A protein has these predicted regions:
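A eukaryote-biased signal for long
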Residues: 127-207
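Alpha-helical interaction segments
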Residues: 28, 66-68, 124, 158-159, ...
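An exposed acidic His-Trp-rich patch
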Residues: 82-139
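Intrinsic disorder/low-complexity signal
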Residues: 4-5, 11, 36, 53, ...
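Short N-terminal edge-element motif at the start of the domain
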Residues: 2-63, 68
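Aromatic- and glycine-enriched beta-alpha-beta binding-site module
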Residues: 49-97
Length: 207
């Protein structure tokens, strides 16, 4: 059975923590709140994450070296439930109220996604006029991709309208987009920390 991209990236995130020897410390575990400190066993802040779970509200607050995030389910949930829900990456992202950049954008991947759109629109890549336009477009496109996405104008948007139509922008927000490694690290860290604390008898299956 082929491993999905999300599973592969979660395994990589887990290995990143294992390599650094991360250890979970239970800071608080009251009727409502569970606070977990997840950091290297030597106490350094490299890849440090702090997790706060509000079980009554069903919210997860993440802070630390890997960025910040607030995710909310709006109904009571245990720590184990939330850790399990987060394994579904896009479901977890859908619960974000705010977060450090959750997506990365890459100009090479953006070009690949646009090429796929052009092929679906039946564009003839052998046409000499198109080839000239396409070469110029690929040279210019990296100027319009940054940490926040793909924001074309000028000749780049003119190219897209010419070959994809005036509704080319529909769905363009996903071009070149991938989930940031920090999201996989947040998920893997919470799962590993909860497992460690449960195995140590510091969290029960009901927590």
């Amino acid at each position: 059975m082929k491993m999905t991209e999300d599973v592969r990236k979660l395994i990589e995130a887990k290995h990143a923590f294992e390599k650094r020897g991360h250890k979970a410390t239970l800071i608080q575990n009251s009727d409502r709140y569970t606070i977990i400190d997840w950091r290297r066993s030597d106490g350094s802040g490299d890849y440090y994450v702090n997790y706060i779970v509000d079980r009554k509200r069903g919210s997860l607050i993440i802070s630390g070296d890997l960025g910040d995030c607030i995710a909310t389910w709006y109904n009571p949930n245990s720590v184990h439930d939330i850790a399990q829900y987060c394994i579904s990456v896009y479901y977890f992202i859908s619960k974000f109220q705010c977060a450090s950049d959750k997506y990365d954008y890459d100009d090479i991947e953006t070009i690949a996604d646009i090429r796929e759109e052009l092929e679906e629109h039946g564009v003839n890549f052998s046409d000499m006029d198109f080839q000239e336009d396409w070469e110029y477009f690929q040279d210019e496109l990296p100027n319009y991709v940054n940490a926040h996405g793909f924001s074309p104008n000028g000749s780049v948007s003119d190219f897209l309208e010419k070959y994809l139509g005036d509704d080319w922008w529909d769905g363009s927000d996903t071009w070149g987009r991938s989930v940031s490694p920090r999201v996989y690290l947040w998920i893997a860290g919470l799962s590993m920390a909860v497992d460690q604390l449960t195995e140590a008898g510091l969290l029960s299956e009901e927590d």
